[in-house]
Amino acid sequence: MRPSKRAADAMRDVTLERAVARYAEGSCLVTFGNTRVLCTASLEERGPPWLRGSGKGWVTAEYAMLPRATHERTRREVNSGKPSGRTQEIQRLIGRSLRAVTNLPALGERQITVDCDVIQADGGTRTASITGAWVALHDCFAWMRARSIISVDPLKDHVAAVSCGIYKGQPVLDLDYAEDSAAETDANFVVTGKGGIVEVQGTAELEPFTDEQFLELLRLAKGGVAGLVELQRKAIA
């Protein structure tokens, strides 16, 4: 049995609260159970230098954890001089996921930076970040359209993400920290609203996993993402 007593295919309670940051063009507070992430989307009128003259915009992301988001205080990464390898990996993943569903030429030569700040971590911070970041980005684009900065919605589709793993021999959906820290296999799936796969990250911690187990994890993930996309739709309605 899972520590949370959830069924194998059950997500934690998920909420998406919009417009939580007064000054950001778009914002969302996302919760996956006890994991809470504040996502803000900010418009910058200039894109990256390497896109100058291309007529194309850019979407990028930054990720950070508050010092007491975890059981014990962690040092702010700014005090060490640079982001950790884990932080860089996660923020690149968030950016790739958002760009996969964005029509970049529709932005013009502008950049949207989505900041994902983990308030409380209980597993699945990167998947929660992607799911909430999409809502913040949606609202940023709506803000831009309302002011005639852009004429069309650059979003091509929804995107959301969920973790899956093998815990005590059983494939399960949406691991919390207790499961993640003891799982034999841990994987993250980023999937669009139409069911297209943006990215898969999977690691066997103890025993290699089989093709059959991977396909079961994929099935669980697609079901989980379908539910998350429906929550996104309701949140922006």
Swiss-Prot record:
GO terms for molecular function: 3'-5'-RNA exonuclease activity; tRNA binding; tRNA nucleotidyltransferase activity. It catalyses: tRNA(n+1) + phosphate = tRNA(n) + a ribonucleoside 5'-diphosphate. One of its GO terms (biological process) is rRNA catabolic process. SUPFAM superfamilies: Ribonuclease PH domain 2-like, Ribosomal protein S5 domain 2-like. It comes from the Bacteria. Keywords: Nucleotidyltransferase, RNA-binding, rRNA processing, Transferase, tRNA processing, tRNA-binding. Phosphate binds at residues 86, 124-126. CDD domains: RNase_PH_bact. It holds the Pfam family RNase_PH. Phosphorolytic 3'-5' exoribonuclease that plays an important role in tRNA 3'-end maturation. Removes nucleotide residues following the 3'-CCA terminus of tRNAs; can also add nucleotides to the ends of RNA molecules by using nucleoside diphosphates as substrates, but this may not be physiologically important. Probably plays a role in initiation of 16S rRNA degradation (leading to ribosome degradation) during starvation. Homohexameric ring arranged as a trimer of dimers. Belongs to the RNase PH family. This is Ribonuclease PH.
